[in-house]
Structure formats: C-alpha cells, structure tokens
C-alpha cells in the first residue's frame, strides 16, 4: 500500500486490518482510532498516510479539505469515546 511502511502495516495488522480492502472498509479515521485504542502511536501524519493509501495517492497530495475532513472525523471519534464527567 502506498504511504504504508512496516511500522504502520504492523499497527494495522494488530487491529485486524490486513490489506487495502480492509482499510477502505474501515476508513482512515476509524483505523487510526482503533490503533490508538490498541495502544499504538497515532498522529495526523499517520492519519493522512492512511487516507492517502485509501485514495492510492501520496498523502502530501491530499487537499486541505480532504485533510480537514478526516481530521474532523478522527476528532469526533475521540470525543465520542471520552468519558463523560
């Protein structure tokens, strides 16, 4: 997969995402959320790498709008999973 090195591939496999088809079904935001919940280290660069892999482009070629969209999706997942106080 484009943008996906050994470390990210290993992190994906740890959460059951074994190939590009699995990643496309899961989506980049949910995949990073799953990695985060599994104790992995996620960051915006990884999120964009995952989105680029889904679109089969280098993550540097994502538009600002595409980056903002997946970032917002990821932040919503984090917010929804935060304990209510």
Segments the model singles out, each with a brief description of its role:
Residues 1-2, 6-85:
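C-terminal extensions
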């Amino acid at each position: 997969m484009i943008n996906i090195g050994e470390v990210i591939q290993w992190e994906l496999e740890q959460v059951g995402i074994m190939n590009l088809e699995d990643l496309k079904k899961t989506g980049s935001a949910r995949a990073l959320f799953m990695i985060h919940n599994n104790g992995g280290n996620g960051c915006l660069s990884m999120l964009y790498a995952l989105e680029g892999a889904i679109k089969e482009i280098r993550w540097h070629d994502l538009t600002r709008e595409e980056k903002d969209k997946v970032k917002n999706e990821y932040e919503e997942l984090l917010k929804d999973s935060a304990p209510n106080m």
